[in-house]
Amino acid sequence: MMKKISKVVLAVGGTGGHIIPALAARETFIKEKVEVLLLGKGLTRFLEGEPDVLYYDIPSGSPFSLRPNQMFSGARQLYQGYTAALRMIKSFAPDVAVGFGSYHSLPAILASIRKRIPLFLHEQNVVPGKVNKLFSHFAKGVGMSFSAAGEHFRCRAEEVFLPIREPSEQIVFPEASPVICVVGGSQGAKILNDCVPKALAYVREKHANLYVHHIVGPKGDLEGVSRVYQDAGIQHKVTFFEKNILGVLQASDLVIGRAGATILNELLWVQVPAILIPYPGAHGHQEANAKFFTQTLGGGTMILQKHLTEESLRKQVLLALDPATSENRRKAMLDAQKNKSFKSLYQFICESL
């Protein structure tokens, strides 16, 4: 018999790769009549237009820096966040806490352990980050976006399903074919903004009705990217951010982007093939994600950033747009999606208590 919970703390912060899954998990808990408190840092821009979210921004710092001044500064901020989280958790009295990775989740995770609140984790990537790997030793269980991450945990670990952001409207491009979406993650990716438009200018020579929806990120050169497409005669829309990302993905024939776990889950959901250029930092997490997506699942191809050129990308785009190649990749993704778990994080937690 599953135990029920009535209150949960979600420890989260950092980039969209951690925050978006946490917000998706929040929706799952809310549907089960569970009261949710978000503790972390950096969520404000993701919560615009969401007045009913219970969220407190608390200090956080990384204890992993090798530079003494940064290490001490990070430790001080971490302690400040920890004491703030202790107060919040004491007042809120949750049944469980769930950490979503990144050092921004540390204050609430540590406070939960101190208060003897049962701890669970959610791992978005194929290879876990430092925080989740370390604190899995204190956790009752880990819910994973991809089952391949399970080999890194000794505690109970299962693949769980998080709801995908529903499209706010269906998007159709009746006069365009093919449609390519370019997305560099929540932070954008300068190298993609520089290289991809120039490569696609050559692709248009074989695909005259090409349409590109390019998301440059918050610091991207919107005008510069638009100018390249305009000069090449490519139909396009360039934006800093896209709230209706699933609607755009559903309307696309191909996606070019980074290999964050969130976008890969969305691609699997809509079965759209991709060319992935994984971010070379973050301890190789995105490269592992990209290998899993392209080699194990068969959903596309990977180009390492050090090998990315206009010519290498042009060749891969033309290959990906070949009807037979595209159909094979879509079929592989459909098969992979059929095999994914539909157990919710809420259900996994209740079963594990």
Curated annotation (Swiss-Prot):
CDD domains: GT28_MurG (cd03785)
Keyword rRNA-binding: no
Gene Ontology, cellular component aspect: plasma membrane
Catalytic activity: di-trans,octa-cis-undecaprenyl diphospho-N-acetyl-alpha-D-muramoyl-L-alanyl-D-glutamyl-meso-2,6-diaminopimeloyl-D-alanyl-D-alanine + UDP-N-acetyl-alpha-D-glucosamine = di-trans,octa-cis-undecaprenyl diphospho-[N-acetyl-alpha-D-glucosaminyl-(1->4)]-N-acetyl-alpha-D-muramoyl-L-alanyl-D-glutamyl-meso-2,6-diaminopimeloyl-D-alanyl-D-alanine + UDP + H(+)
Keywords carried by this UniProt record: Cell cycle, Cell division, Cell inner membrane, Cell membrane, Cell shape, Cell wall biogenesis/degradation, Glycosyltransferase, Membrane, Peptidoglycan synthesis, Transferase
Binding residue positions for UDP-N-acetyl-alpha-D-glucosamine: T15, G16, G17, N125, R165, S186, Q286
Family matches, as InterPro entries: GlcNAc_MurG, Glyco_trans_28_C, GlycoTrans_28_N
Gene3D superfamilies assigned to the protein according to its UniProt record, in alphabetical order: Glycogen Phosphorylase B
Catalytic EC class: transferase
Pathway: Cell wall biogenesis; peptidoglycan biosynthesis
One Pfam family matching this protein: Glyco_transf_28
One biological process term in Gene Ontology: carbohydrate metabolic process
Bilayer topology annotation: Peripheral membrane protein
Keyword Nucleus: no
SUPFAM superfamilies membership: UDP-Glycosyltransferase/glycogen phosphorylase (SSF53756)
Its EC number(s): 2.4.1.227
PANTHER family (UniProt xref): GLYCOSYLTRANSFERASE, UDP-N-ACETYLGLUCOSAMINE--N-ACETYLMURAMYL-(PENTAPEPTIDE) PYROPHOSPHORYL-UNDECAPRENOL N-ACETYLGLUCOSAMINE TRANSFERASE 1
Family: Belongs to the glycosyltransferase 28 family. MurG subfamily.
NCBIfam families, A to Z: murG
Protein name, as recorded: UDP-N-acetylglucosamine--N-acetylmuramyl-(pentapeptide) pyrophosphoryl-undecaprenol N-acetylglucosamine transferase
Gene: murG
